[in-house]
């Protein structure tokens, strides 16, 4: 097996079936909910769980109201929505019409990467979802898990990212204005593929000009190449879409029944405004074709005007794991000669990787 897969298989397993490792407890995986997110990172085999909390609505063990409420003015949604209406509490089951019955896989891009998914209605605040990552099948990959009401309505969904890489070995970058940012070494959801090694080679080349000749040695240095992939994101949404396989095609993914597919996500008009937000939550694997940009604060709660690089305050729709957030709009301006943002069109449909 490849080194990146070996590293995952050899990692010390976490949790047990009776006591799964709580991904929202960064101290020791215990029962206390410390920090939540829409994306949880797994780097070892084992049994895992996460609480029924909207995105990052719990921070440092307390309610993080700024993740879903704002008094900002402009083109903003002052209280962010769940599938039904404005959120009133960080814990899903403490909101109206949010009784959870089950949990299931939406998709995963590695066969049997995540198994034994179940909803456990235990303890306070709506219990938790647990799942297993087996040593025999662990490898870099992505999965989306959703919880449902009794009639099958999706209430919320989370991204599980399995990787051996250390996301917290950040790189410091500086934008055009001299502001510094610490960024992850990987795109969100990045998974490396098989590693290819190329040995050093050399050959003799003879040059002849007129009556003179000269033989030169051309040497090619050894090289290491690792292709990979990462999922795609639609503006303002928390859930990833299946990645490309490196060509103009979708990487093979598997549904809840283990059936493989290379089909693109469903594309559908999911409405506009408040209805668009609710329908995106209800349909995490449907790409919204409706060209609606009514609210500018879906990924930064206080952002009320286009083209203004206000400090990002992470929201419950942010797709990043604990410790990270969507960067400010001018974070990468130091990379371009013009020192401008990559796209300033207000009505564009954007993909993010």
Predicted regions and their residues:
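Conserved positions within compact, well-structured domain cores
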Residues: 4-27, 36, 44, 73-135, ...
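Structured alpha/beta or helical-core interaction and ligand-binding surfaces enriched in interleaved
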Residues: 36-37, 53
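A short beta-turn/strand-edge loop motif at beta-sheet boundaries
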Residues: 57-58
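Generic detection of short hydrophobic beta-strand segments and adjacent strand-loop junctions
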Residues: 42, 48-52, 160
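Terminal domain-start segments
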Residues: 65-68, 81
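Short acidic/polar inter-strand loop motif in beta-rich domains
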Residues: 151-155
């Amino acid at each position: 097996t490849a080194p990146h897969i070996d590293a995952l298989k050899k990692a010390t397993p976490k949790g047990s079936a009776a006591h799964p490792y709580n991904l929202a407890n960064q101290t020791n995986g215990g029962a206390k909910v410390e920090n939540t997110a829409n994306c949880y990172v797994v780097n070892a085999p084992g049994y895992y769980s996460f609480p029924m909390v909207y995105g990052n609505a719990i921070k440092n063990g307390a309610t993080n109201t700024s993740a879903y409420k704002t008094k900002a003015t402009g083109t903003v949604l002052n209280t962010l929505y769940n599938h039904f209406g404005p959120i009133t509490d960080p814990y899903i089951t403490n909101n109206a019409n949010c009784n959870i019955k089950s949990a299931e896989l939406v998709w995963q891009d590695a066969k049997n990467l995540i198994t034994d998914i179940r909803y456990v209605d235990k303890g306070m605040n709506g219990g938790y979802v647990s799942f297993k990552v087996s040593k025999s099948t662990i490898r870099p990959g992505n999965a989306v898990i959703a919880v449902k009401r009794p009639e099958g309505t999706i209430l919320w969904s989370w991204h599980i990212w399995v990787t051996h890489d250390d996301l917290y070995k950040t790189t410091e970058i500086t934008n055009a204005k001299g502001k510094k940012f610490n960024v992850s070494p990987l795109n969100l959801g990045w998974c490396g593929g098989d590693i290819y090694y190329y040995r050093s080679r050399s050959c003799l080349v003879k040059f002849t000009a007129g009556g003179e000749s000269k033989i030169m040695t051309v040497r090619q240095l050894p090289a290491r190449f690792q292709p990979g992939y990462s999922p795609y994101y639609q503006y303002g949404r928390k859930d990833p879409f299946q990645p490309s396989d490196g060509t103009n095609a979708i990487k093979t993914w598997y549904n809840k029944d283990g059936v493989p597919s290379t089909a693109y996500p469903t594309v559908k008009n999911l409405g506009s405004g408040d209805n668009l937000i609710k329908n995106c939550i209800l349909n995490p694997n449907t790409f919204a074709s409706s060209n609606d940009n009514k609210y500018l604060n879906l990924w930064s709660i206080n952002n009320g005007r286009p083209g203004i690089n206000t400090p990002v305050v992470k929201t419950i729709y942010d797709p990043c794991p604990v410790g990270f957030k969507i960067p400010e709009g001018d974070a990468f301006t130091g990379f371009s000669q013009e020192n401008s943002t990559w796209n300033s069109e207000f009505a564009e449909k954007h993909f993010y990787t």
